[in-house]
Amino acid sequence: MGRVVTWDELDLLRAQWRREGRRVVWTNGCFDLLHVGHLRNLQACKACGDVLVVGLNNDASVRAIKGPARPVNSEDDRAELLAGLACVDAVVLFGEPTPEVSLARLKPEVHCKGADYAPPHGKPIPEARTVAAYGGAIRFIPLVPGRSTTGTLEKIAGAGGGAG
């Protein structure tokens, strides 16, 4: 089980992991309504190395990416939930729309993305040049069919959105 850390704390942890020869994996996202697809994705990310760091979009960046009605859960709640997962070693907040700055600072050996970004027909990966510049690798993690936060929200809205 991990913990929520500041960037300064993560810098110290990264130095320790380097000394120990541990392979650091990074993934990032909004993780607004945590679901089994997120869990399986994070478990697959952890399997790519020794230490999993999750970059969590802060509330302002989630609003910029997903719209004014999001996030449903606050950054503090989302971070605590992620840190409570056995496969997650550290959670750090970031505010940029893409993780280039975070990746350039942490320099993880592996950057994990969803398979929807995989070439040749995947979405663009703006941070690919950053990862290549420090010698990291990008791994594509299969998505879990039928599991998404947007799908969950649509299901709730379709059910009338009433409290349960």
Model-inferred region functions:
Residues 1-164:
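Nucleotidyltransferase catalytic core that binds NTPs
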